[in-house]
Amino acid sequence: MSDTEELYSRQIAAYGTNSMNKISKLKILIYGIRGLGIEISKNIILAGPQKVTIFDNNKITIEDLGSNFFLEEKDIGSRRDKTSIKKLLELNNYVKCDYLKDDNLEMHLKEYDLLIISEIMDIDRIMKLNKACHLNKKGFIYCLVFGLSFYCFVDFGKHIINNINNNEQRRYYIKNIKKGKKTMIFIDNEFENFELNEGEYVILKDIKGMSQLLDGKKRRIINCKKDKFEIEEDSTNYEDFIQGGIVEEVIENIIIEYKELEEMINLPEKCEYINPTNKELNLHLAFLSLHKFYKENKKLPDSTNNDLNKILNITKYIYKKNKKGWCKNINLDEEYIKDIYKYSKCEISPICGYGGGVVSQEIIKYIGLQ
């Protein structure tokens, strides 16, 4: 066993050699190295990609020491990424780690497979970066921690899911085939129950006789019983069935295309996969309000009454504007939203740890799409 195989032995056992090879070729750019960004960086460097680049040219403050576990008091005033990279380099000698000198993310995108933004920025720029990633088939993740709240938006473009339920392909032995306007296939279920359902597809193999059924085409099951089913195929003039054969389940691939943030900004109205609760709708409203406040003030709100009143007015404006759209199902919970705003500047370490785990798992999912 080589050194790298020994280092990643548990991952290889969990994901398989093919997935580990994909991870080892991945190049990731991470914007924002506070609590959430450092958790993501740490997790993914330990997973063994080819390259991880970070960017955060903000100066380290005393507040950063509460969430970025690589920083010390003596680092206050230094640049976040330049200081953090020293410790990140120690995590895994097989991963190239560096930091960008400038924040021209648009120019650097072509060098990476995946862009992760873990720091709030102008929502218009976020949407432009997302669009650039979408058009160029790059992965995109935008994730934020506001106090006790964690947000994550993922866009991995168009992809195919193979075997969505990870089921083992089912096969059954053929006992007999009856010719007719509809072809009836009898299953030998002496040792195994027949568990396929009407509407599913099968391929027929290794039949002696009836060579017309051995064309490799998938056929739809109809009139399914416990030991037989039919296919809509006129076999009246086919060769006679002699013996044997296998019915093999066809596991259909599912095509999914992630939507861009610009379209999904009205998520509760357009998302096909969830039925959001009132609390989740209020969270989304808070997410939009925080971005509008940030765009207008170049900062997140303080816990002062002045800032809280400003952002609550923004929230009411967005709510009223979309009352006939996605906000029609929201019972506005001002106290709940106000608590989010009070602590929006804070990145609480346990929440960052949780969020970092979620994002890291999304990155592992991404390699399955390549």
Language model regions located:
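Adenine nucleotide-associated cytosolic modules
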Residues: 1-370
